[in-house]
């Protein structure tokens, strides 16, 4: 254990108070020559760390799993999951929770090492991670944070000095991931599958205390827990859809109880608007396509409700009815939040009957003309309609007149409407070709400057700054669709 606490470590281990079936205590596997390649200064400060101390060899050794800070209690979490619809017992196959950092404001965050070596849940995996996917998770999770979308975050990336073997030999790395917690829908499925009502209750009680203390007292606390998770996920999925984010692997083990986005493996942001957009190389049926995400979230939440049935009510029929009633509320909550978000994207303060139609007409035209999702709303926000097939079409010009007259009918000024649009339409997103460009420079050439410049731009997605304009350019047309892989 490293005892130098000038770095600011302040660890607790509340997860280890759960029954032992929920985890396995195991130390990380040391690596040969760790090197810090990325540290998140602002996140470090918010967690109560001293960033300069974290750059020292003693702390780099912690990020690499070669040492443990005082108070660490490394463990791999057990969970289950429906992966593309098929149920499996799973667990952290290459990640370890080393503890929960208590911040100066009293908040609690999991500190997890990802790529820290094999665990009892590794199956045939080596427990390691490659540098490219770890940097990719860093870039996209930080972009999501800047977009004000709940997400796990990345504190540090270290290279291990050792190769990782996938299809080819790749440089190894470990990511330090930060999350409100790593409790998933799959964690509840795991408890339910094991058949211990006591364990299921322990997990639910722990989750309420940690994430939803305001529902500690009511009689129907487990129903209230389900309600809160449904609300959080409805809000999260609406936010994904509004910025064109496609997660790619919405298995139940990747749906957090806290409502944070987790697992940035095959995710990507949509370029031209298409409800059927899929990037993941393994999602051959389009199960997790952009337009399917709200439905898949409801499906995943139904699996949570199923897992909770033994503790929702002592009468199984009544418990089933409660579960069905609560799940049925997801679609209405999601639709309302998405619609409200779309109105903001178009500068609409008030309500008019034809607002739904106005939004749907625009989206249909965007799909028909393969218009870039982000740049269409960016152009509307700037009120500069460049020569594109969409903007040149007679049907868009007709729609534009309807939209402008709609803006004129509301009490708020057009100036206020455009300001609201600016705050809800990101000027830039982590476009796939720019992310790949940054990863190629870092992994192949050891040049992190491209990534740093990209991260700097992505940190202010609503700034509409002139020096960001190069990141607004869409990728060159190609016959080869962009594909993502589950490297994270």
From Swiss-Prot:
Mg(2+) binds at residues 254, 263. GO terms for molecular function: AMPylase activity; ATP binding; magnesium ion binding. It catalyses: L-seryl-[protein] + ATP = 3-O-(5'-adenylyl)-L-seryl-[protein] + diphosphate; L-threonyl-[protein] + ATP = 3-O-(5'-adenylyl)-L-threonyl-[protein] + diphosphate; L-tyrosyl-[protein] + ATP = O-(5'-adenylyl)-L-tyrosyl-[protein] + diphosphate; L-histidyl-[protein] + UTP = N(tele)-(5'-uridylyl)-L-histidyl-[protein] + diphosphate. Its EC number is 2.7.7.-, 2.7.7.108. PANTHER family: PROTEIN ADENYLYLTRANSFERASE SELO, MITOCHONDRIAL. The lineage of its organism: Bacteria, Bacillati, Bacillota, Bacilli, Bacillales. This is Protein nucleotidyltransferase YdiU. ATP binds at residues 91, 93-94, 114, 126-127, 177, 184, 263. The active site is at residue 253. Belongs to the SELO family. Its cofactor is Mg(2+); Mn(2+). Keywords: ATP-binding, Magnesium, Manganese, Metal-binding, Nucleotide-binding, Nucleotidyltransferase, Transferase.
């Amino acid at each position: 254990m490293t005892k130098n606490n000038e770095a600011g470590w302040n660890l607790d281990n509340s997860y280890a108070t759960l029954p032992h079936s929920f985890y396995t205590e195991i130390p990380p596997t040391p690596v040969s020559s760790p090197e810090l390649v990325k540290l998140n200064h602002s996140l470090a400060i918010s967690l109560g760390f001293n960033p300069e101390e974290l750059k020292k060899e003693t702390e780099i050794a912690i990020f690499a799993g070669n040492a443990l800070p005082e108070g660490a209690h490394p463990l791999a979490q057990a969970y289950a999951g429906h992966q593309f619809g098929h149920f499996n017992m799973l667990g952290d196959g290459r990640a370890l929770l080393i503890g929960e950092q208590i911040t100066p404001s009293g908040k609690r965050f999991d500190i997890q090492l990802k790529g820290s070596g094999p665990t009892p849940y590794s199956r045939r995996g080596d427990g390691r991670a490659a540098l490219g996917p770890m940097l990719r998770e860093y870039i996209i999770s930080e972009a999501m944070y800047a977009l004000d979308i709940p997400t796990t975050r990345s504190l540090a990336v270290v290279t291990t000095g050792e190769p990782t073997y996938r299809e080819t030999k790749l440089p190894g790395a470990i990511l330090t991931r930060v999350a409100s917690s790593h409790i998933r829908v799959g964690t509840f499925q795991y408890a339910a599958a094991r058949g211990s009502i006591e364990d299921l209750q322990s997990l639910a009680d722990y989750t309420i205390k940690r994430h939803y203390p305001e529902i500690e007292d009511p009689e129907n606390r487990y129903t209230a827990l389900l309600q809160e998770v449904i609300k959080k996920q409805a809000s999260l999925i609406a936010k994904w859809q509004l910025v064109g984010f496609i997660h790619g692997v919405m298995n139940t083990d990747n749906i957090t109880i806290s409502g944070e986005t987790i697992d940035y493996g095959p995710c990507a942001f949509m370029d031209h608007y298409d409800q059927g957009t899929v990037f993941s190389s393994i999602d051959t049926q389009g199960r997790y396509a952009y337009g399917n995400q709200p439905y898949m979230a409801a499906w995943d939440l139904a699996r949570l409700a199923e897992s909770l049935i033994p503790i929702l009510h002592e009468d199984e029929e009544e418990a089933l009815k409660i579960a069905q009633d609560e799940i049925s509320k997801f679609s209405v909550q999601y639709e309302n939040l998405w619609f409200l978000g779309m109105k903001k994207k178009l500068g609409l303060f008030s309500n008019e009957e034809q607002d739904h139609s106005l939004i749907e007409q625009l989206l249909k035209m965007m799909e028909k003309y393969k218009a870039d999702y982000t740049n269409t709303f960016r152009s509307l926000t700037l009120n500069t309609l460049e020569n594109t097939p969409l903007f040149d079409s007679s049907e868009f010009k007709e729609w534009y007149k309807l939209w402008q007259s709609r803006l004129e009918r509301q009490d708020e000024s057009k100036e206020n409407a455009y300001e609201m649009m600016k705050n809800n339409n990101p000027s830039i997103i982590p476009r796939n070709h720019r992310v790949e460009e940054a990863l190629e420079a870092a992994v192949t050439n050891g040049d992190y400057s491209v990534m740093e410049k990209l991260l700097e731009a992505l940190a202010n997605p609503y700034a509409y700054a002139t020096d960001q304009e190069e990141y607004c350019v869409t990728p060159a047309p190609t016959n080869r669709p962009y594909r993502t892989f589950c490297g994270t």
